[in-house]
Amino acid sequence: SAASDVYKRQAYYGPFRDAAHSAPGFGDRKSYQMDFANGQEALREIYSDIQEGADVVMVKPGLAYLDVLKEAAMTVSLPLAVYNVSGEYSIVKAAAANGWIDERRIVTENLTAMKRAGAKIIITYHALDMAKWLAESNTPGE
């Protein structure tokens, strides 16, 4: 079965749309994307998708919708996935490049928050960096 995919119309998708040259040429996507201010709509969509046979529930973007993820974790028995989208990644990378944040600490906190909110699966552009950091922290003698 397909995964339930809960996402909202909002600004976090801009970097991906720009990179993929997939910004709408006309009109907008509001007619089929949920209102980002309405968490209950996202939950209704999750429950509807489960009734239709979803095997996994995916919430994206991750950081802005931790409340939806947490609520789903308390009410849904399916595995919960969260997608740390390109906009979230770009914000971290830009701030780190400017020396405003410690990238490793921010990424670790962000992904930990997603796990704490109930994600069993985390999809992120930070995966390779996080794997490297985890391997370094598990190196004997350090």
Which stretches of residues belong to each language-model region?
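Conserved, mostly hydrophobic/aromatic
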Residues: D49, M114
